[in-house]
Design a protein with these regions (language model features):
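Acidic, glycine-anchored loop motifs typical of Ca2+
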Residues: 20-22
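Short, 15-30-residue, compositionally biased linear elements
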Residues: 72, 76, 329-331
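Helix-capping and short linker residues that terminate individual alpha-solenoid repeat units
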Residues: 13, 17, 58, 78-81, ...
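Non-catalytic C-terminal accessory modules of carbohydrate-active enzymes
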Residues: 211-367
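Aromatic- and acidic-residue-enriched carbohydrate-binding clefts of CAZyme catalytic domains
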Residues: 24-37
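Active-site core of glycosidic bond-cleaving carbohydrate-active enzymes
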Residues: 2-6, 10, 37-44, 48-59, ...
């Protein structure tokens, strides 16, 4: 797998980056006519690929690759946070490119609307959208030839991917999270396009849940998770539809993303490092939740179970593991300087982190 990953990254940053600015060119996940530029989601996931490759290179003991990939990941992260960010809008842009690309993208949006109208899809809302893009085209015509910057044409949900991935600065993240919730969200989560304000999809709501979780906003993340739960089994028992609440494919593997990932990685706070037989755990219970429990969670060649329960004496944490040779770091905010009971022994915490080993661990954080 690793050799193919290296080939893929090389392809992204050479053949797909003809101007050498580290923003790969081409269509991203959005299926929008004409939106063929340097898109924010592609740039973000390219940055994530570089970061992951730097860690993989360490495992495969390549002497120069870890530093090379890590440096490129850091540069791309900074470029995304500067060149894609529009401070006046308080948002990351749809794409980065030239005024000519912005005009072509807008014309593509108009053509897509006209195709729908010709097919008999006409409504006052569509007419309003058509007028918006025509006015945008007039506005774009005022820019000098060759102007290069970040552009908004659709305000697609992928503007949240820098937050989902955790590479946004905190101030930018909080500002955009609040904006999306207030201005871009419908009944079941973010609109695919905040300009069109029509369709919502499970993937967009999932990304928004993960974005909220990435910046410690547990209750806000669970608000989006609940929107996905509301669509559960609408079309097919035990499944979540692609388009919310009940349209599109009734079964797609990624529709579980917005349920499983926020819960496992944020509420339970489980972060695996399977290669090193290590797991970090930092739970975040939503408001009003007194207990959580997850059983038989596969992690590498191991299986763990983890539970948190608030009691009259304090909060109990129970961790069991199939393997005895794994190591765990349990992080509890505000633990430093307080007493806790670990496997029957009363101790005083020197930090917020507790190291755990073995197959069974029981910890009581004394209130």
């Amino acid at each position: 797998m690793y050799p193919y990953i290296k080939q893929g990254i090389n392809w992204l940053l050479t053949e797909q980056d003809r101007n050498g600015n580290m923003f790969p060119e081409g269509y991203g996940i959005m299926e929008v006519k004409g939106l063929n530029a340097e898109l924010v989601d592609v740039a973000v996931y390219a940055q994530q690929a570089l970061d992951a490759a730097s860690k993989m290179a360490v495992i495969f003991k390549e002497p120069l690759a870890p530093k090379k990939y890590a440096q490129k990941a850091a540069i791309l992260k900074n470029k995304i946070n500067t060149l894609f960010w529009d401070d006046a809008e308080g948002s990351y842009c749809d794409f980065y490119g030239t005024i000519e690309q912005a005009i072509a993208t807008t014309k593509g949006a108009i053509e897509q609307i006209e195709m729908g109208i010709n097919a008999g899809k006409y409504s006052p809302e569509i007419a309003k959208k058509q007028e918006f893009y025509k006015e945008l085209l007039k506005h774009l015509a005022t820019f000098p030839e060759g102007t290069e910057k970040g552009w908004f044409t659709n305000k697609n949900w992928v503007i949240s991917t820098p937050i989902e991935s955790g590479i946004a600065t905190s101030d930018k993240a909080i500002r955009l999270l609040d904006k999306v919730r207030k201005e871009h969200t419908g009944e079941y989560g973010p609109y695919l396009s905040a300009v069109e304000r029509r369709s919502m999809m499970t993937i967009a709501t999932s990304v928004q849940a993960m974005a909220e979780a990435a910046y410690g906003r547990t209750d806000e993340a669970m608000w989006y998770v609940d929107k996905i739960v509301q669509t559960f089994s609408r079309v097919l028992p035990g499944s979540i539809s692609e388009s919310m609440p009940d349209r599109g494919c009734p079964v797609q593997a990624w529709t579980i993303y917005g349920l499983a990932s926020p819960l496992v990685t944020h509420v339970y706070g489980i972060t695996p490092d399977s290669y090193n037989k290590a797991i970090s755990i930092s739970p975040n219970l939503p408001s009003g939740w007194d207990n959580i429990s997850i059983s038989d969670l596969p992690v590498g060649n191991n299986t763990i179970s983890f539970a948190v329960k608030k009691t009259g004496k304090g909060t109990e944490y129970n961790l069991s593991s199939k393997k005895a040779d794994w190591k765990y770091t349990l992080t509890l905010e505000g633990l430093a300087g307080t007493k806790y009971v670990l496997n029957g022994k009363t101790l005083k915490a020197n930090s917020n982190e507790i190291q755990l080993v073995g197959k069974e661990n029981n910890l009581l954080r004394i209130d």
